[in-house]
Amino acid sequence: MNKKQLHDLRKDLQIIFQDPFSSLNPLMSIGEIIGEPLRIHAKAQSRAELDKEVSRLMDVVGLSARLFNAYPHELDGGRRQRVGIARALSLQPQFIVCDEPVSSLDVSIQAQVLNLLKDLQAEFHLTYLFITHDLSVVKFFSDKIAVMYLGQLVETADSAELFRQPLHPYSQALLSAIPIPSSRQKMQRVKLIGELQSPIDPEPGCRFAKRCLYAREGCTGRDLALRDFGSGHFCACCRAGALEEQTPSK
């Protein structure tokens, strides 16, 4: 992809960064930060038109107009992240990568930002790729889920289906670790064993095998492809679908 193609792609594809503190230029005002993509892509014919669009975007994400000339250090984490969201929306993209957008925020602010992202998705018909380690956020936010382990895709399914019936042992371990208030609904904890292998130079085969209680000889030595288990549920595990009948090997 050449420079021009990448420039054009950015109009449709934007990103909301994890850290609202380091992703904003401290030397630029809030108005300048939000307006920068509009200026680069010549989306405004005049300074007045640019300022008007920036003000509109600030209103969309719930930022007061009085912050137009403020600087990032004057804002708390939640409002800084709203600036990042407004900047991502400025070019009217179709696809936004949300890279752990609430993980660095206070818990009291996380719900506000998540609800804002949900509302914006409905209003502007956005598609999100939402990257997170927080399974509660995943359940609240996602229509489809892809589970990765050491850079390897191990399971994909609709959100409700994966939470109802996880097939991969790693997915089962993740879901079993979610705290559930009701003692009647507790899921049996799946404990992991062993050490992580190097993600830089992984051994062939399932990268989870050395930590899996159900691993057998066929799990190593060759990479495992995703298999279709119906209803859009895919899993890269040679023992998926029969784990309940198996005895852990370790």
Protein language model features and the residues they cover:
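ABC ATPase NBD coupling module
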Residues: 1-14, 40, 161-166, 197-203
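Hydrophobic anchor residue at the start of the ABC signature
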Residues: 34, 85, 109, 113
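Conserved ABC ATPase "signature" region
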Residues: 48-66, 172-176
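Conserved ABC ATPase signature
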Residues: 71-75, 79
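A short, proline-enriched helix->beta-strand linker immediately N-terminal to the Walker B motif
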Residues: 90-94
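P-loop NTP-binding/switch modules centered on Walker-like glycine-rich loops
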Residues: 101, 105, 109-187
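Short catalytic/signature loops enriched in Gly
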Residues: 158-250
